[in-house]
Structures are given as structure tokens and as C-alpha cells.
Regions:
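Residue-level signal for the short linker/turn that defines the boundary of a DNA-recognition helix
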Residues: 13, 23-24, 36, 51-54
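Short alpha-helical DNA-recognition segment
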Residues: 21-43
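A short, Lys/Arg-rich alpha-helix, primarily the initiator
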Residues: 1-21
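Residues within the helices of the helix-turn-helix
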Residues: 16, 27, 57
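Interfacial/linker helices and their anchor residues that mediate assembly or domain coupling
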Residues: 75-112
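DNA-binding alpha-helical recognition surfaces that contact promoter or target DNA
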Residues: 13, 17, 31, 42-43, ...
Length: 112
């Protein structure tokens, strides 16, 4: 499987999971996201068609999440992304300071 196919499959799975977690049917999701044809949601969730970025934003909003969470590289990152998205400016400032003060060994490889 190519990288593109893996990314498409991951996004399709996350779109379906986010919709189900939001408690929406395919038809309800289409209405919430402003999509006139609900079968497009099915195509997104099956990986047959990738949503354009503006549509991905609309879907994320309808599902109560963010495009970043839907596109996260791995599932472990999703709770962190959600917490950052919900943080206020003071919390984000504290997080930035904490990240800046991480020892080099705990930072991303190659960032030294």
C-alpha cells in the first residue's frame, strides 16, 4: 500500500469514527456540514474520495473535532491535539514554555 493509500484509509476511518462519536447518521452529518448529497459522506468514509480541505473543516466542525485531529499521524496524538485545541491562551503560553524547556534528549530527533 502506498503512503497516499495509507493516509486516505486513515482519514476515512477517522471520519467515520468522528461521525459515530458525534452521534450523527450519515444524513445528519451531511446536513450539519452543509453537504447537499449525503452519499458524499459515504464516499469519504469508504476512502473512495478524499474531502477537500474546506470540506474537511466543515466535517470536523460538525463532528466537534478539528481537521488536525482527523489528520493526526497516529491515534496517540489525538487526545493531545484535542487538549491543545481546547486550551485557552494562558494554558497555551504555559505549554510553550514547558516545551521550550524540555531537555534536548526529550525533543524531537534532529532538533538539537
Amino acid at each position: 500500500m502506498t503512503t497516499q493509500e495509507l493516509l486516505s484509509a486513515r482519514l476515512a476511518r477517522r471520519l467515520r469514527e468522528a461521525r459515530v462519536q458525534a452521534g450523527l447518521t450519515v444524513r445528519e452529518a451531511a446536513v450539519q456540514a452543509g453537504i447537499s448529497n449525503h452519499t458524499l459522506i459515504v464516499k469519504y468514509e469508504n476512502g473512495a474520495v478524499a474531502p477537500p480541505l474546506d470540506r474537511l473543516h466543515d466535517l470536523a466542525r460538525a463532528y466537534g473535532t478539528t481537521p488536525a485531529a482527523l489528520l493526526a499521524e497516529n491515534d496517540a496524538a489525538m487526545p493531545v491535539i484535542a487538549a491543545i485545541d481546547q486550551a485557552d491562551s494562558a494554558q497555551l503560553a504555559h505549554l510553550a514554555v514547558a516545551l521550550e524547556n524540555l531537555p534536548a534528549s526529550e525533543q524531537e530527533p534532529g532538533s538539537e
